[in-house]
Structures are given as C-alpha cells and as structure tokens.
Amino acid sequence: DGIAAMLIEPMMGNCCAISATTEFVQLARRLCDQYGVLLIIDEVKTGFRVAKGGIQSLHNVKPDICTFAKAMANGYPIAAIGGREEVMRTFRPGGAAHGGTYTAHSVSMAAAERCLQILDETPALATLAAYGESLKSGMKQILDRRGIVHSFSGHPSMFGLFFAPQPPNDYRAWKKSDYSFYDKLARHMQDNNIIVEPDSREPLFMCEAHDQSCLADTLRAFETSVDLTLEQVEEERRAS
C-alpha cells in the first residue's frame, strides 16, 4: 500500500547499456498490475533511438508513464513525458503539478517535429543499427586477433564494450570489475582524434551522420589505441 510506482530503465544509459531481459520487464508489468502500482519506464536515452516505439516496444510492454529526451530532437534541449490517458489527465489545474525546464522552447519543438518526421519516413534507425553492428564487428575482429577477452552489451545503436567474457548484469557487477583497460583505451582513442567517453560506464552512441569513412577512421584509431593500451599495461606491469 505504500508503493506508488516502480521506475525502471530497461537499458542502463549510464552503465555500459546493461540490459534487462524481456522476462524481467514483463514481470515488472505484471507485478505492477497485480498490486495497483504505476510502471514508469525511463526512455531518456533509448527513446527514438533503439526503435520507433522505444525500448518498451522491443519488450512488448506498455508502461503507465514513460520519459523521453535526447534523440527526440537530435541533440536540441528537450524532454517529454507520456503515458496512459487516465494518468496524464491528472496533470491539470487542481491536479498534479508539472513544470519543465524546456517548456515552450519553440526551436527545440521544431527540431523534434522534424526529427520525428524523419524517423517516421526514412530508415534512419535501421541505418544506425547497421552502423553499430559494423562497428562492433570491426572491434571484435581487432580484439580477437590480439586474444583480448571482451563482450558487448546493449543495442547496436547504443552499446557498451566490456573486457570480460560476459557483460555485467547490474551496476554492482560493473563496479566490482576491472575496467582499467577501457579507461586507458579511451584516452588513447582521444589522442587519435576519436572522442569517446573516458568513463567505461557510458555506452557508445551511433549517429546517422556517420558514414563508412567515419567507420574506417574509428576502427583504425581503435586498432592503434588497443596496441598502445597493451604496451601501456605491459610497461606498468614491469614497473610494479
């Protein structure tokens, strides 16, 4: 009786894109229905990126409330909340209050309208996923040739790279892992003109503007950076 809602992020946007299973997400839906609890899904990073219907559509689950931002306007500052009609009608004078930092930002609204139109009328999301698959495949070949154990988590359009046989299944597992190889690798990538997040928790995000030339540049820098990281690790081992 004391629980109003369950908030879940089926793909962790700030931790390697660690993903919940469909069974878990659907169980969350059933439990919320059973106990009269609202199910809220955080789609701030996955919405309009992994699928037109967001991560919820991939799990075939409808939340009571969901949140969107980021890809919705392709980088312009915007955020949105949506949900079941019964829930959304509570946001009214005399009902639940709601304010927004980006409320009535006309430029962002125009950008979002155009962005959603493009997503609806073109294969942009399929292009993102295909690019991500190619990037993962190239990375895998480079790492396999050097015998470096690794795994990927998340969706092709938004994935994490993890240096272990299996990706972590929650934040605590990531926290206990040795992510120092990625940290070193990321800095070498930056030195080779590929800007990646230096924190291994942040996934790699695909962009529809990236073409095959960008892919080739990224993989060349990745291969060079892997070798530099291996050299750095060996130097540190000898010095210790």
What do these predicted regions represent?
Residues D1-S240:
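Conserved N-terminal phosphate-binding loop of PLP-dependent enzymes in the Aspartate aminotransferase
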